[in-house]
UniProtKB/Swiss-Prot annotation:
Phylogenetic placement of the source organism: Eukaryota, Fungi, Dikarya, Ascomycota, Saccharomycotina
GO cellular-component term (any): spindle pole body
Key words, A-Z: Cytoplasm, Cytoskeleton, Nucleus, Sporulation
Function (record text): Involved in the pathway that organizes the shaping and sizing of the prospore membrane (PSM) during sporulation. Required to localize MPC54 to all four spindle pole bodies, and localize DON1 and SPO14 to four prospore membranes.
Protein name listed in UniProt: Prospore formation at selected spindle poles protein 1
Gene name for this UniProt entry: PFS1
GO biological process: ascospore wall assembly
Length: 237
């Protein structure tokens, strides 16, 4: 009797043989056996493989066909310590080579992405000067009125300015006091017009006066709104 079964009884030996036969039958009926049978016997030989990792001749021919800017370089000890440390990774880089990116191709890819921007803003920039041939686009208008001449803009501004002319020809600027309500301008102009208010004062104002009046108007509205805001204190908590 075989020495391997000296410790087994007859029922146990029969059960062991039956289990081995069942395993063999299951393996033969599985797709694994069919796949293994299709593998050629010389698959493990290096000279017949089609993978460059295991075929030096194929890997050398593939290296010669690469473009010059994509060919990997040999990492030597004369290079920086960061690059030479790659030689310590034989599993990742068995031949000490590292493909470097091409700066020119990276620049072309960047230009291609930039050109895919919105057409409305691709040809215009705040940094462009008047000598580069670009013109201000028609949609760029800080005012609601499109393509209004500068003279008409100034006259339109003057018509909406809350200016009050005194009897001695002085301009009253106390209308910009922050204690007025937000609708102080509408309230002032609801009164009956007098000869003093009907005076044509637009021609007597300079650009500096217009800017000053607009500045005071905006400042008064901001201060009025600031005083209306409620500030939290420690008593609220």
């Amino acid at each position: 009797m075989n020495q391997g079964y000296t410790q087994l009884s007859a029922p146990e030996l029969k059960e062991t043989k039956t289990s081995k036969l069942n395993k063999m039958n299951n393996f033969r009926s599985s797709p694994i056996a069919e796949i293994i049978n299709k593998i050629p016997p010389d698959c493990g030989k290096i000279q017949n493989t089609t993978f460059p990792e295991f075929n030096p001749a194929l890997r050398r021919r593939q290296h010669e066909q690469w473009p010059a800017y994509e060919k990997p370089i040999r990492v030597t000890d004369s290079m920086s310590p960061q690059l030479s440390s790659i030689n310590c990774l034989p599993n990742l880089y068995p031949h000490g080579t590292l493909p470097l990116p091409n700066p020119y191709l990276s620049y072309l890819n960047h230009i291609e992405k930039v050109n895919c921007q919105d057409v409305k803003f691709s040809n215009w920039s705040v940094l462009h000067n008047s000598n580069n041939g670009f013109e201000i686009p028609t949609y760029f208008s800080p005012r609601t009125t499109q393509n209004m001449p500068c003279s008409e803009k100034v006259e339109s501004w003057l018509e909406r300015l809350p200016i009050f002319v005194g009897f001695d020809g002085y301009l009253f600027t106390n209308c910009f006091d922050y204690e007025y309500m937000l609708d102080w301008e509408e309230t002032e102009f609801t009164f009956e017009k007098t000869s003093c208010m009907e005076t044509d004062y637009s021609k007597a104002l300079t650009d500096t006066d217009i800017i000053y009046i607009q500045e005071k108007k905006i400042e008064a509205l901001i201060r009025n709104q600031y005083l209306k805001e409620y500030e939290f204190s420690q008593k609220d908590f």
